[in-house]
Structure formats: structure tokens, C-alpha cells
Amino acid sequence: MFDRKAYKQIAKKQLQGRYATPILIMLFTTAVILVINIPTFIQQARMYEAGGEYYTMMEGLGSLMGVSVILSLVSFFIIGVIEIADARFYIVMSRTTEKQTFGTYIKGFSLWLQGFLGMLWMFLWVFLWALLFYIPGIVKAYAYSQMFYILAEHPNVGVRKAMKLSMAITKGYKGDLFVMSLSFFGWALLSGLTFGILNFWLVPYMEMSFTNAYHALKAQALKTGTVTADDFGPTDPELPGAATTEANAENGSAE
């Protein structure tokens, strides 16, 4: 059973007194994304200044396209690393009541290759499905949504297998994940009214809630035999409770 209300309630308790580092992570990721977009902003400004000068604008457009291609590759790398570092950080947060430092988040950067390949692979498949129709692209995005959690918890599993495992544990629950996303929509609107200030509370709350959903989906899939512990391989030994997690997985019980 998918109990989004329970995952959200647990998330609130897990974050009590521990918001400092998640907020710092938000500030860091926002700054990084702004920095990698600076070249695009500069090129757009130059085109605007060129006004109606056709050749200058065409030259600027060609330059902008070249910059965009390079930035896209850089963005895949950076966003992939950020995604897997986020996933690992919130898995740690979900398994211990201790306050976590920014260093816990930085440790996730060691999984940079898994993050980059995961982002590239996921984008490719979501894009291909979206070429058919928009809705299948959304459905597949939710099917692949657990991939970064799996890669963060089981770094040796491999990107392609992590995607297949994500599809397996979300089978029959993609609609639930979609509804869970919608349940935050009202808060997102309110955040817009506060010029994004509310995001400092909302984003960690969402991240923690979806991490709890991941644990539940994985535990349910193990319990029903949809997947096995061997499918995932060893858990990252540096994660809190890794030994206990391995034992529970072998028994097919909830983590």
C-alpha cells in the first residue's frame, strides 16, 4: 500500500531541528545552476544589444547554439552529480536522527560517474518516449524516478540495471507518485507568492517525503518477490545502518 500521507508526516518529524544543512544544500545548488547559465545570459544580452543588425544577430545565434550544446553536456554532468548527491544525503537523513553536515552531502560527489550516466540515460529514454506523446514521457519519468536512490544506496548496481529496478519497484505505483507530486502543488504556488522563500522549507520536505516513498516501494517489492536483494547488490557500507539493511533485504522485510 502506498501511503503518501504517512511518508509526508514522517518527513516532517525527520526534518525537525535538522533544516540547516538541507537549506545550505539548496543555496549551493541554486548558485551552481546560476553560474553554469551565465554564458547563456551573456550571449542573449549581446543579441539583444545587436538590435536589428541581421548579420550580428545570426552570428550571435550561431555562437549561442554552440554554447548551448556545451552547456547541455556540462548541465547533464552537474545536475546528475547533484541528483545523486541529494539522493544519498536524504537516504542518510532517513536512517539516522543525528544532524548531518554539508560534508555528508559532499560525499555523494564520489558517485559522479553514476550520477552523470544516470541523468544522461534517463533523459534519453524520457525524451524518446515523449516524442511519441507527452503523457508517455511523464509516465516513464515516474517509472525511472527511483533510479538515483538505487544508485546512491547500491553504487555497484549499474545505471541500466538501476533503471530496470526502478521500473520494477514503481510498477503499479506510478499514479500514486504522480498524485504525491500534485499534493505539493499548493505549497509550490504559495512559494511563488513568497518569491521562493518558502522553498527553503518546501524542497527539503518534498525530498524527504519521496525518500520515504522510495524505502516503502523497495521494501514492498522485496516482500512480494518482484525484486530480490541480489538484484540490488551490496549496500554502500558508509550509509548508516547498511549492515541492518542488508539483513532485512535478505529476509524480504521493510528497511
What are these model-predicted stretches?
Residues 1-255:
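Hydrophobic alpha-helical membrane segments
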